[in-house]
Curated annotation (Swiss-Prot):
GO terms for molecular function: indole-3-glycerol-phosphate synthase activity; phosphoribosylanthranilate isomerase activity. SUPFAM superfamilies: Ribulose-phoshate binding barrel. HAMAP family: IGPS_B. It comes from Streptococcus thermophilus (strain CNRZ 1066). This is Indole-3-glycerol phosphate synthase. The lineage of its organism: Bacteria, Bacillati, Bacillota, Bacilli, Lactobacillales. It comes from the Bacteria. It is an enzyme of class 4 (lyase). Pfam families: IGPS. It catalyses: 1-(2-carboxyphenylamino)-1-deoxy-D-ribulose 5-phosphate + H(+) = (1S,2R)-1-C-(indol-3-yl)glycerol 3-phosphate + CO2 + H2O. One of its GO terms (biological process) is L-tryptophan biosynthetic process. Keywords: Amino-acid biosynthesis, Aromatic amino acid biosynthesis, Decarboxylase, Lyase, Tryptophan biosynthesis. Its EC number is 4.1.1.48. Pathway: Amino-acid biosynthesis; L-tryptophan biosynthesis; L-tryptophan from chorismate: step 4/5.
Length: 255
């Protein structure tokens, strides 16, 4: 893959979307609203735990994982939501993983993919997702707003992902309630946890904020805990010898 990761991924997504048909809408899976949960549980740093077999930056992470057992361990140890990679080409995920996990857990599930079209949103909802990901860097603002409004009209919540101040301002402008700050640059795939710390000075009162990527230890989590409602963690949990212990380590008590 070229150095410019995001354009390469989006080119592939356009090919995939061209092959998708718009599915008939199935009933929305019932669970709590992530936004409400994060707003009312601010005494500790909440964990969005990710099921991820591989990534462009890490290569294969854990190909043999029992995805349902992994997800249940997350839930049993207090995860606020489970993020499921559904991208096949770059992350070795699958929409079927989302379906399997969503039938076995009661907490919200996030469809983690590069979404550029309504067909992907309906497919994710039908597979059991209650939250979808929209990436500011992947979409023009007007299209981002269209997809955001489409998803929320279907009863879904949306995690709007940002990486810099102009993107954060876009998320605020479109009225995003759940905003992610990705510590990973999607062009280079390099990470820097200071991205979260720097952008936190521009946060507003209404949204909830999630720090994503580059969080491996309790020490990392403690750095962002004063400023964020939650963290999204994948690799650290997928490679942990003791998953339950790792989840607990990252759940920083905020009093």
């Amino acid at each position: 893959m070229s150095k410019a990761f995001l354009p390469t991924i989006l080119e592939q997504k356009e090919k995939e979307v061209a092959q998708l048909v718009m599915e008939d809408l199935q009933p929305l899976r019932q669970t709590y609203r992530l936004y409400d949960f994060l707003k009312s549980n601010q005494n500790k740093l909440q964990i969005i735990s990710e099921v991820k077999k591989a990534s462009p930056s890490m290569g294969d992470i854990n190909l043999d994982v029992d995805i349902v057992a992994q997800a249940k361990t997350y839930e049993e140890n207090g995860a606020a939501m489970i993020s499921v990679l559904t991208d096949e080409v770059f992350f070795k995920g699958d929409i079927s993983y989302l379906k399997e996990i969503s039938t076995q857990v009661a907490i919200p599930t996030l469809a983690k993919d590069f979404i550029i079209d309504e067909k992907q949103i309906v497919r994710s909802r039908n597979a059991g997702a209650t939250v979808i990901l929209l990436i500011v860097a992947a979409l023009p603002e007007a299209r981002l707003k269209e997809l955001y409004d489409f998803a929320t009209s279907l009863g879904l919540e949306v995690l709007v992902e940002t990486h810099n101040l102009p993107e954060l301002e876009v998320a605020h402008r479109i009225g995003a309630e759940i905003i992610g700050v990705n510590n990973r640059n999607l062009m280079t795939f390099e990470t820097d946890i200071n991205t979260s710390l720097e952008l936190s000075t521009h946060f507003k009162d209404k949204p909830v904020y999630i720090s994503e990527s580059a969080i491996f230890t309790g020490q990392d989590a403690a750095l962002v805990a004063p400023y964020f409602n939650g963290i999204l963690v994948g690799t650290a949990l997928m490679t942990a010898d003791n998953v339950a212990k790792k989840v607990k380590e990252l759940q920083i008590d905020k009093g």
